[in-house]
Amino acid sequence: MKVTAEDMGVLLLRVPAGLLLMGHGAQKLFGWFGGGGPEATGEMMTALGYPQGRLMGLAAGLGEFGSGAGIALGAATPLSSAGLITTMTNAAVSAHLSKGLWAQHGGFEYPLILATGAASLAVHGPGRLSVDAMLGCERKGLAWGLAALALGLGGAAAVLALRHRNTTTTSPAEPW
């Protein structure tokens, strides 16, 4: 197989984004990379209005770590993309939306670009240098992208609906 510029382009998008998302999950799950681990993440989730903060923090960490791994490997790409969209939409709405767009002010720029990239990846597919392609189960196209977006936004809406509605917080600048 001859590796093309397109193969390399999608690989260069997938791997760093997936690994960085795994890192965010590891911060929540294990306290690695300067993260707070389950205790501090649970406290943050409670401050953001989520019930059972520790459990919700573990779910967010697992979502980020698992989706990040899937994105990096190009495995179960539409499902991995949906998981990334779910976690990043929750982060954008619960922790960043009130701070505006730009990341330097704690805004939702970073989760927005990751979620949009995930939707784009679901449309484009993970490319030939992926687990999906190696297993012959690559799923891509507009229908798969829209399905990932719908599943991701639906999952986010379900989790966001659990939050306490009258909670006002002063969350850390980089909680997710």
Regions found by a protein language model. Name each.
Residues M1-K28, A76-W176:
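Extended, low-polarity transmembrane helix blocks
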Residues L20, H24-A60:
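Solvent-exposed, well-ordered loop and adjacent helix/strand elements within mature globular domains
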Residues F30, I71-G74:
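Amphipathic alpha-helical interaction elements
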Residues F30-F33, F65, F108:
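Phenylalanine-focused residue identity feature
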Residues E43, A60, G74, L84-T87:
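Internal, well-ordered alpha-helical scaffold/interface segments
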Residues L55-S67, A82:
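Hydrophobic alpha-helical transmembrane segments
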Residues G63-I71, A95-H96:
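Hydrophobic, membrane-inserted alpha-helices
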